[in-house]
Amino acid sequence: MAKRLLPVGLVVGEITKTDTINYRTFKPETGGL
């Protein structure tokens, strides 16, 4: 199960290694959103 905690950047799925995660594409966004 994918975990979604808003605001974006906290926890998206199991990906927590990047600063900001695009919750729509589940891809790391450089520089944040």
From Swiss-Prot:
Keyword entries, A-Z: Chloroplast, DNA-directed RNA polymerase, Nucleotidyltransferase, Plastid, Transcription, Transferase
GO CC field: chloroplast; DNA-directed RNA polymerase complex; mitochondrion
Localisation: Plastid, Chloroplast
Protein name: DNA-directed RNA polymerase subunit beta'
Subunit structure: In plastids the minimal PEP RNA polymerase catalytic core is composed of four subunits: alpha, beta, beta', and beta''. When a (nuclear-encoded) sigma factor is associated with the core the holoenzyme is formed, which can initiate transcription.
Protein EC: 2.7.7.6
Family, per entry: Belongs to the RNA polymerase beta' chain family. RpoC1 subfamily.
Catalysed reactions, semicolon-separated: RNA(n) + a ribonucleoside 5'-triphosphate = RNA(n+1) + diphosphate
Entry function: DNA-dependent RNA polymerase catalyzes the transcription of DNA into RNA using the four ribonucleoside triphosphates as substrates.
